Structure formats: C-alpha cells, structure tokens
C-alpha cells in the first residue's frame, strides 16, 4: 500500500468526502536543501547510510546548477575546506540563491575575503556561520514573493520555510478557499508569515504566534514592507498560547488583549511531531479549524 492509499484509509473514518491530491514534479522542486560536507563531497544520510553527491536532482534547478560550482570552489581552497561541516541552500521564485557555510572553527578575515570574491564571481549571497558568529556578503534576510507576487516575504538562513515551490501556491490557495464568514484569525506556528500575509486580506484581524525569534523578526519586517495593519504577533509557543487562553499573562504580548478579538477560525501548522494534548484542548473549542500537516500519522492521531 502506498502512502496515499494508507492516508485515505486512515482518514476515511473521519472524512468521507472526496480528497483532492496535488502532485509536484518529482525533481527540481525543493527551494531549501541542507547537506553535510565530507570527503570533498556533499553528504546526505538515508537509512543510516552515507550518500555522497555533487548535485541533488530534487533541488530547484538554480541550486542544482550551482552545487558543482560551489563544491569546486570549496575543494580547491584549503581555507574553505578546513572544518567545514554543513552547506545549506535557499532559493526563491526569481532563482536567487543564498548559500550558508557552517564551520567548526573561528571565521577569520582571510575566509571572509575568499567568500567575498566567490560571491561576486558566482553572483550569489553567502552566509558564513560558526559558534556565536555570522557573516553575510549581503543582507542576512533572504527575500521571496508569494501569492502571485502579491506579498514580499523574508527568511533567514536558518528559519523554516515551505520547501516545495510547486505545492506552496496550491497550499495558500486551498487555505483561502476553505474560509467562510471570516472574522478574526488565531494562527499558531505562523513562521515567517507564509499564510499570515495573504490571509490578512481576508480576516478582520489576525493574532499570529510563533516561538522562533528569527521567524518573528522576518514576519515583522514583512508586515512593514507590505503595509499591513491588521496583524499582531507574539513570540509564544503553542503551550504558551494554551496558557494564555487559560488566563496567564505574558509580557511578550505587550498591549495585545485577547478580549479585543472575535475569533472565527484557528490555523495551525505544527512541526512533524504534531500538536500536544494541551494545544488540542484549546483549539477544539474553535468552530473552524484549519490544520496544515507535514506528517499524516501525527495528523490522524491529533484529529482523533
């Protein structure tokens, strides 16, 4: 039984209507890729085995094209190779690319000068990371555009962003299509605002929560850039949101008051581990729940 049929069988107990399945191409779809570096190659692990590669067919074509070029630059330069252990890529709808090189050593001026030259040569931005240190050849923010380029959105090199460039627009459009009689929205795990920004045109007000500091910074930057005035956000975990609804006061909420909201919908986009019991107890009191999941097993477990 393939994964689709397994999910259809598991969900049938709770949902009997037609299920629409969207597919992306099997290659060239990933906007975000992370690799180790070992033996002069990119390194991935699968089924406890090491896989060495020079390019990665699942990555967006702009990343695929760059991977051998960057690998060559690293391998011919001992300063770049030394104690390099991870190489991350991010790309966007314009095929811009940000590359992060992560080291187990102090980043010195020589390394910075080398990466500046490579950045100019390849016409891409680089991030150099080591413990408690970050250097960027350009901005530490990576810009992308969503919802038919209607919104400018920001990422950092280490915050979560939906990786599939073909499925993401369909996800946003599907969420929008599910909304009827919108009033105010509570959003948990809002990230950098992938859904928050387009939904701001549908709901009267949005209270968005997220535990990651960098993601909140990206969202705040996007709110200002896109001239949006109906999104409030706070750095809260899902457990803290549950505590908030049970009366706990958080200084991080500032002047945000729950009593000012008339929530008609809640949207959750949790990690693969799904929702904890406390969060489920809170959101099940909402009439309309939109649950975006990357793990069908925890999704089924949560809706039970």
Enumerate the predicted regions with their spans:
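Short, well-ordered strand-loop elements centered on a beta-strand within folded domains, enriched
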Residues: 40-47, 95-102, 133-135
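Extended interfacial segments that mediate partner engagement and assembly in macromolecular machines
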Residues: 1-84, 93
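Rossmann-like S-adenosyl-L-methionine
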Residues: 2-6, 106-304
């Amino acid at each position: 039984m393939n994964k689709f049929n397994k999910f259809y069988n598991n969900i049938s107990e709770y949902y009997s209507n037609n299920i629409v399945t969207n597919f992306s191409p099997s290659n060239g779809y990933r906007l975000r890729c992370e690799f180790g570096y070992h033996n002069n190659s990119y390194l991935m692990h699968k089924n406890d085995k090491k896989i060495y590669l020079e390019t990665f067919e699942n990555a967006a074509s702009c990343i695929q094209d760059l991977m051998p070029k960057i690998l060559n630059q690293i391998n011919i330069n001992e300063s770049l190779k030394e104690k390099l252990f991870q190489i991350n890529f991010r790309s966007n709808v314009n095929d811009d690319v940000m590359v992060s090189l992560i080291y187990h050593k102090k980043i010195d001026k020589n390394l910075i000068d080398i990466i500046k030259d490579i950045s100019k040569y390849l016409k891409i931005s680089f991030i150099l990371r080591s413990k408690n240190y970050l250097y960027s050849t350009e901005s530490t923010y990576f810009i992308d555009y969503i919802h038919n380029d209607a919104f400018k959105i920001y990422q950092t090199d280490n915050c979560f962003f939906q990786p599939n460039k073909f499925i993401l627009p369909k996800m946003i459009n599907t969420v929008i299509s599910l909304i009827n009689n919108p009033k105010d929205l509570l959003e948990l795990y809002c990230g950098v605002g992938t859904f928050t920004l387009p939904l701001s045109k549908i709901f009267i007000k949005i209270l968005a929560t997220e535990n990651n500091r960098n993601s909140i910074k990206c969202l705040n930057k996007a709110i200002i850039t896109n001239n949006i005035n109906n999104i409030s956000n706070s750095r809260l975990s899902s457990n803290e949101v549950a505590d908030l609804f049970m009366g706990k006061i958080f200084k991080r909420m500032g002047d945000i008051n729950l009593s000012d909201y008339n929530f008609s919908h809640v949207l959750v986009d949790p990690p693969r581990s799904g929702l904890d019991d406390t969060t489920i107890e809170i959101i099940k009191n909402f009439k309309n729940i939109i649950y975006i999941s990357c793990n069908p097993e925890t999704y089924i477990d949560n809706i039970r």
